[in-house]
Amino acid sequence: MFGGRYRLIDFPLSNMVNSGISEVGVITKSNYQSLLDHLGSAREWDLARKKGGLYILPPFGNVESTLYRGRIEALYGAMSFIKHSRAKYVILSDCDVVTNIDYKPIVAAHIESGADITAVAHTGVYSSDDIKTSTVFNVDADKNVTSVLINPDISGTCTTSLNVFVMSMDFLIETVNDAMARGNVSFERNILQEKCRELKIK
């Protein structure tokens, strides 16, 4: 929280609204009453509307109503909301990265490239302490992701994931359902890393 009023989730919400996105689903974690109180009616982000709007989704990973263990399981728990959306493309974003991003050119580039997944990343010089809890991409000259490192013990110039991803809604649904059928729950490890050479990731 910043200044007692703002929270980290305000950044991705503002980015989405400023990018013209009118339908946003927030998958919560445990003890989320304070988040509900903070988001209120969603009027602050102009998301209090009859079509689209802000949807608060419970933190359950499956029919047994247990807390989700990873991004894949969280998305599977929100599958009813996802399938009812009329959006053709989806942006997945964590809420703990402070960024100011216009998503419109990113989505346009994703469509033009024909990628399965477009990952938003930052290239910079990092210490080993900075990078040890991050996902790092190795990319070629055409900015295709060639390999993925998770929580690596490295330092220097790295391209690190900002945990923002663009993909088609159809690809998301197919990927989540396939991963769950195989018992996979980690988007980073089971999708980005394991299928890096199979998928086109930009």
Regions inferred by a protein language model and the residue ranges of each:
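Unchanged
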Residues: M1-K202
